[in-house]
């Protein structure tokens, strides 16, 4: 297996190409499919759900989480555990929240600067 250079990965990331980022063998020793949130189209979300089959997550800074009132799912986890928040769906232009379209819409809502807590539902 070959790995891309950082420059190649950044170029592809900017273009919206999904990448597999591999962590350290001393941690989980696994790869995560990542894509720029601004490029998370329904087709990309569908690919991630179909091929990677894991949770689709949106990493966010603490200030943004606070602004959206997204609390941690579990307080004070172990240092290497993922810090998940409560799950959310966008309120506008979604149906059940599970389709690729709905998930892409939720990602777009999470990163839009005018989105507030009132624009999200907790399923």
Locate the predicted segments by residue.
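Catalytic domains of riboflavin
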Residues: 1-123
